Amino acid sequence: MNVMKYMLVAMVVLLASCSRSTTDYAEEDYDLLFPFAGIEKPKVSYEDQIVQQGNPDAPVSDFVYPGVEINTNVRTYNLTLTCQFREVDILGNNVPDDDLASRFVVRYVAANRQLITIASNTTNEEAAQYLTNGKPLELHFKAQSGFPMYLLVNGVGPRGSSIKATISAVSEDGFTIVKPLTVNEHQNEEGMDKIKGPFCAYIILP
């Protein structure tokens, strides 16, 4: 009888030790512990000098200044634009001005943030300057960090004509090297035709 009593007591103790706790814990407010801070915007580093593409066929009226405001570590740059077109006859000689057929355009953003057109043909009413056949044109101006070093080259010409342009920037502090934008296009098809590689791109100066 005593053995049965001890076995019964042992079973009661064992069951009590294995029973789960029924204590209720306070529900955590995870919104308070981990508040949503919104989607983090990607950080853009203009030090990377990413070449951003534009539309070489867009009209001047569609232009929107693509520069940005940079307020720290602002640098000043000396920009240089050089461009030249050439139209030759079957002997390789420059075509006289009165017989020129090329209609090339070079566009850049000037220091006043306006899109400026340079043209090979004097009938282009949008042009601020005109190119002379076979002679390079060189322009210089200053700009600061956040300015778009911009170059557009497009147009049509007869076989054997060509258009080339380069824009570059050198920082006055001497420490920042900006890769230039360069175009060199030749029209080699019969008759009048568009250049094969119209170009429009810019780099935000870091």
Regions found by a protein language model. Give the residues of each.
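Sec-dependent bacterial lipoprotein signal peptides
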Residues: 1-19
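Low-complexity, repetitive regions of proteins mediating host interaction that are extracellular
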Residues: 2-5, 38-42, 200
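Acidic/polar, low-complexity intrinsically disordered N-terminal segments immediately downstream
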Residues: 18-110, 206
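Hydrophobic beta-strand segments within beta-rich accessory/binding domains
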Residues: 78-93, 140, 144-157
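Exposed low-complexity, polar/acidic, P/S/T/G-rich flexible segments that act as propeptides
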Residues: 103-108, 159-173
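Tryptophan-paired
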Residues: 110-143
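Short, solvent-exposed aromatic-acidic interface loops
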Residues: 156, 179-194
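Short, low-complexity, Pro/Ser/Thr/Gly-rich segments in the mature regions of secreted, periplasmic
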Residues: 192-206
